[in-house]
């Protein structure tokens, strides 16, 4: 019975590793896919080869094996804790009647069309702007190497095509990362006299980091989050943990 349960657990770990690597079939590759997949593969190997694990923990490398296991366990706890904080930040919407500036964070543009993730952000922005017709909007994001137009321009075009008045939309098309998204948007807000409380439109995993950058620019961030594509989301959540760590180390 124990062997059956162990094999089932190993198969689950292998399936989880494959799931994190699935975006590779669509040309998506980043570190947030790799380290969870590697951890699940390591767990699968430990479950499938228990005798080897026993020798490792009772042989000459016993202390090293215990240290590595403890470090990995601590890392998993940290990742889960940060994911909890990310989830909490994603559940902080603007209050009813609160004056906000909607800031739509850019994402990949394919030619002149939004990617799946950017389209989800545009849809969320459209829903909020439609329900709050007095709210101004800043579309953010510069032009990447493989993009024919800036991410900000793509957002603006799509929102206008969906029925949002173009006069409500300001363009910030110079930023190349989230920190610049917020810093350059803050400059527009100050110049135009817009509300300094911002409703950040982005994937849920992105909200905590965006709110940190917003606060450092003197803005008070609220969340208008959208769910990520089922195949892409988990890897981006785990990548976001590393991005938050990098931002902390760099002092952003």
Locate predicted features.
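A transmembrane-helix-recognition feature enriched in membrane-embedded lipid enzymes
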Residues: 233-252
């Amino acid at each position: 019975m124990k062997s059956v349960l162990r094999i089932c657990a190993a198969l689950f770990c292998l399936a989880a590793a494959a799931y994190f690597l699935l975006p590779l079939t669509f040309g998506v590759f980043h570190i947030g896919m790799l380290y969870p997949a590697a951890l699940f593969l390591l767990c699968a190997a430990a479950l499938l080869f228990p005798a080897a694990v026993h020798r490792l923990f009772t042989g000459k490398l016993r202390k090293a094996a215990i240290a590595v296991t403890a470090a990995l366990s601590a890392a998993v706890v940290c990742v889960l804790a940060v994911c909890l904080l990310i989830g909490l930040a994603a559940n902080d919407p603007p209050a009813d009647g609160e004056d906000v500036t909607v800031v739509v964070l850019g994402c990949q543009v394919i030619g002149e069309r939004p990617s799946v993730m950017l389209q989800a952000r545009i849809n969320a922005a459209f829903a909020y702007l439609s329900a709050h017709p007095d709210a101004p909007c800043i579309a953010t994001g510069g032009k990447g190497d493989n993009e024919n137009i800036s991410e900000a321009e793509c957002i603006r075009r799509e929102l206008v095509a969906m029925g949002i008045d173009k006069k409500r939309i300001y363009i910030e098309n110079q930023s190349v990362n989230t920190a610049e998204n917020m810093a350059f948007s803050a400059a527009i807000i100050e110049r135009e006299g817009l509300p300094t409380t911002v409703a950040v439109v982005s994937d849920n995993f992105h909200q905590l980091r965006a709110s940190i950058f917003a606060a450092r620019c003197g803005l008070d961030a609220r969340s208008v989050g959208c769910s990520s594509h089922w195949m892409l989301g988990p890897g981006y959540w785990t990548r976001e943990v590393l991005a938050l760590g990098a931002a902390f180390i760099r002092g952003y």
